[in-house]
Structures are given as structure tokens and as C-alpha cells.
């Protein structure tokens, strides 16, 4: 029986990549800086002391980090990672961006080698011609925002006006994204989704290569209690080249079970079943449940988004550390479900250093940890592209070769 469990710890970078200077990210180090803050008791909100992740250590995260940075994680010693059970290494990104879509597509063997379209202006971010087309087609009373913003902050600033006027809040960031925030009840979730779908069509028709249109629903009655809900939806471009998931379905009649926002990231392409799940607790338990029932030629593919969206972007070191420790506590259950012949792969899609300036992603190397009971444990080295993961999975399932990447086994 052949099964792959592919876990994306969204934003768990392990040190700035060689090209980080091009992104003003030299020195960024998501895992390293979290461990440092924990070690010096500067991340003690709802937790205390050094970062406690024994199961990630067992899979080789400390060795992976050390090989990426040349440094040792503060708060850990060499004895702790002496009994590693998985092969470990790290990878640099080939794609031109440091965003969710680029990272995930590349992991699946389809790197994005062109340039995304970015809305670079901090104010009046979206071209007036584009806004006019959207307003006209959707018969909107107007829009609010039209700027770079933090999603949690802009609803505090404009949420009340949005409720009064019915104007959706448009905003973006340094990533290739078009985000729309609307009140889930007053405006309506289905109306928000419909707007996002239409904007995706307009962008595609007008040759804007924008990675994602993101619905950002929120609830509350005023700026003091507005909160985003779990009903976010990402409407992505479709991958520009074939992924290992498509090959598995086409060549082996296999199944790809997408958990969390995975299906949205790939625009539903190469996905057999989409399971909606939000929050770290629910994502962990849904993943464990699906692992228990996974059949032959199946991939269980989960994105643990909270590391990025809840703690990374919000620069919450304590929250990120606490999240890692919770995930680690559930990781032991996942490891116990991996049988001989299975592949359990843990990696990330980019960095989002919670100690870094601003609120954006950081260009970093990512860990590659591969656990397969009974297989030889080895150092996987420095991989030049995340696509080595996709190629490894393709070879494991005896699929035709991917265009990008080299198998690690």
C-alpha cells in the first residue's frame, strides 16, 4: 500500500535564503527567532520557557535548521536530536515570489517562474480602470480602502462605514493578492463569495496575473469587537503546469484529500475531495481522522494556516510558539499512524518571521522532513527547489516524471 501524508506548516521558515536580499529579508529566521525569544523568556504569553517540540526534533527539525543556517537552535542540545527517525534536509524556493501560491505550486512540482502582478502603490493601490470595471459589472455603490493594509486593522477602521454604506472593503499587501472584506451577516457571505468570483474573472480577462482573490468575512457590531471568521475563501489562478496530484489521479486513479485551504490554493485542480477545516485544533484532528482511513494511492494534504495568518502576519511570537507546541503534541499521534511503506512529509511554503519588520512573508529556506518506517535515515542536503518534494512523490507512486525537481530517494 502506498500513501503520502503531506503536511505544510504554513510559514515555518528556517533561515533566510541566498536570494533573501532581493526581498529585503536578509537575516529573517522564523524558527530561529521564535526559539531565541522563548529561550530568553520573551515569549511567555500563555506559555513559558524554551520552545518544547520533542516530536519535531525526533523528525529532524533541529538538524534541518542547523544545515540551513549553520547555527544551532537556542534552547536545544545535540543529545535531544540524537534519536532522529526521519530523513531531513532543507530547500530553497525557485519561484519568483514568497507567497502561499508560489510555495504550494512549487511543492507540487509546478513552480511559478513568471512574475506575479503586484499592486505596489500603498494608497490607491488598484488601477482606477480596474475598479471602474468591477463597480460597473457588480453594480456596487462604491468601494472602501483601496490600499495596502493589515486585514485585522482595516476592518477596525472601515468596518462601521462598510456596514452603513454597503461598500466592500478592498485592500492588498506586498503579496500578489486582491482581498475583499465584508460583514458576514450584514453584507452576506454568499454575496462576498460572488464578488470575489467575479473579480477573479475580471482579473483573468484583463491579463492581471494576480495569485489570489481572497474573501475576508468578519462579524461584530463595531470597531471594538470586529473579528474575522473562519469562512475565508481563496480563489486562485490555476497552476500553469501539471502537479503530482493531477498525475496521481490520471495515471493511478488515486485520491488527493485536501484539508484546510489546500483546494483553494490549487483552484480545485488535482483534488479528489475537499474537507473544510479551520483552526489548528480542528486541522490536526481532521488530518488524524483522514490518516486513519486513507487507502492505497492516496495523498492526505493539509495546510496548517494559523502559523501564518494568526501568528506570523500578526507578529505574535508567543502565539506562534504555543501553536508549534500544540502541533507537536498532536504530531506523535500522526507519527503512530504512519505504516511501513508510507511517506510522511513535513515542510513549509515560505517564512513569516514574527520578529521581523512589517507584517509580510519572509523569503526563507524551508525544512524537509520525511518519515518512512523501515527506510534508511539520511541527510537530504540542500534542495534547489521545493519541486524536489513533488518529484519524490511522483517517483514514489511510480508516476511519469515531473518537469521540475529531482527525487530525493
Swiss-Prot record:
Positions with a binding annotation for Mn(2+) 2: 308, 313, 361
InterPro entries per UniProt: Alkaline_phosphatase_core_sf, DeoB, Metalloenzyme, Phosphopentomutase_DeoB_cap_sf
Pathway: Carbohydrate degradation; 2-deoxy-D-ribose 1-phosphate degradation; D-glyceraldehyde 3-phosphate and acetaldehyde from 2-deoxy-alpha-D-ribose 1-phosphate: step 1/2
Keywords associated with the record: Cytoplasm, Isomerase, Manganese, Metal-binding
EC top class, as a word: isomerase
GO cellular component, one term: cytosol
Keyword Ribosomal protein: no
Main subcellular location: cytoplasm
GO molecular function: magnesium ion binding; manganese ion binding; phosphopentomutase activity
EC number: 5.4.2.7
Bound cofactor: record note: Binds 2 manganese ions.
Cofactor: Mn(2+)
Single GO BP term: metabolic compound salvage
Pfam family, one: Metalloenzyme
Subcellular location(s) per record: Cytoplasm
Gene3D superfamilies referenced in this protein's UniProt entry, alphabetically: Alkaline Phosphatase, subunit A, Phosphopentomutase
NCBIfam families associated with the record: deoB, PRK05362.1
Family under the similarity heading: Belongs to the phosphopentomutase family.
Function: Isomerase that catalyzes the conversion of deoxy-ribose 1-phosphate (dRib-1-P) and ribose 1-phosphate (Rib-1-P) to deoxy-ribose 5-phosphate (dRib-5-P) and ribose 5-phosphate (Rib-5-P), respectively.
Family annotation (HAMAP family): Phosphopentomut
Listed name of the protein: Phosphopentomutase
Organism lineage string: Bacteria, Pseudomonadati, Pseudomonadota, Gammaproteobacteria, Enterobacterales
Amino acid at each position: 500500500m502506498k500513501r503520502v501524508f503531506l503536511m505544510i506548516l504554513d510559514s515555518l521558515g528556517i533561515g533566510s535564503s541566498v536570494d533573501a536580499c532581493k526581498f529585503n529579508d536578509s537575516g529573517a529566521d522564523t524558527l530561529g527567532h521564535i526559539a531565541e525569544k522563548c529561550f530568553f523568556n520573551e515569549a511567555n504569553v500563555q506559555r513559558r520557557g524554551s520552545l518544547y517540540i520533542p516530536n519535531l526534533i525526533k523528525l529532524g527539525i533541529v538538524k534541518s535548521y542547523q544545515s540551513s543556517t549553520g547555527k544551532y537552535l537556542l534552547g536545544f542540545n545535540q543529545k535531544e536530536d540524537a534519536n532522529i527517525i526521519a530523513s531531513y534536509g532543507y530547500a530553497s524556493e525557485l519561484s519568483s515570489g514568497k507567497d502561499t501560491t508560489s510555495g504550494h505550486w512549487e511543492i507540487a512540482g509546478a513552480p511559478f517562474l513568471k512574475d506575479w502582478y503586484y499592486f505596489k502603490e500603498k494608497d490607491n493601490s488598484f488601477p482606477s480602470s480596474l475598479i471602474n470595471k468591477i463597480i460597473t459589472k457588480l453594480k456596487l455603490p462604491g468601494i472602501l480602502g483601496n490600499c495596502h493594509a493589515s486585514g485585522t486593522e482595516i476592518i477596525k477602521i472601515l468596518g462601521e462605514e462598510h456596514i452603513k454604506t454597503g461598500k466592500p472593503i478592498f485592500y492588498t499587501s506586498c503579496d500578489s493578492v486582491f482581498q475583499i472584506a465584508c460583514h458576514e451577516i450584514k453584507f452576506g457571505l454568499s454575496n462576498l463569495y460572488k464578488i470575489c468570483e467575479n473579480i477573479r474573472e475580471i482579473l483573468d480577462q484583463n491579463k492581471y496575473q494576480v495569485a489570489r482573490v481572497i474573501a475576508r468575512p468578519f462579524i461584530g457590531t463595531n470597531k471594538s469587537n470586529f473579528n474575522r471568521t473562519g469562512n475565508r475563501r481563496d480563489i486562485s489562478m490555476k497552476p500553469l503546469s501539471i502537479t503530482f496530484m493531477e498525475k496521481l489521479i490520471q495515471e493511478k486513479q488515486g485520491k488527493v484529500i485536501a484539508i484546510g485551504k489546500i483546494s483553494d490554493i490549487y483552484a480545485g485542480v488535482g483534488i479528489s475531495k475537499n474537507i473544510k477545516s479551520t483552526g489548528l485544533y480542528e486541522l490536526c484532528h481532521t488530518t488524524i481522522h483522514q490518516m486513519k482511513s486513507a487507502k492505497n494511492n492516496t495523498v492526505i494534504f493539509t495546510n496548517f494556516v494559523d502559523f501564518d495568518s494568526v501568528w506570523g502576519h500578526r507578529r505574535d511570537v508567543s502565539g506562534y510558539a504555543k501553536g508549534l507546541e500544540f502541533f507537536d503534541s498532536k504530531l506523535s499521534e500522526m507519527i503512530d499512524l504512519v505504516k511501513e511503506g508510507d511517506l510522511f512529509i513535513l515542510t513549509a511554503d515560505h517564512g513569516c518571521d514574527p520578529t521581523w519588520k512589517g507584517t509580510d512573508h519572509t523569503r526563507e529556506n524551508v525544512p524537509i522532513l520525511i518519515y518512512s518506517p523501515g527506510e534508511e535515515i539520511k541527510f537530504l542536503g540542500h534542495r534547489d527547489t521545493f519541486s524536489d518534494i513533488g518529484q519524490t512523490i511522483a517517483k514514489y507512486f511510480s508516476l511519469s516524471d515531473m518537469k521540475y525537481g529531482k527525487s530525493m530517494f
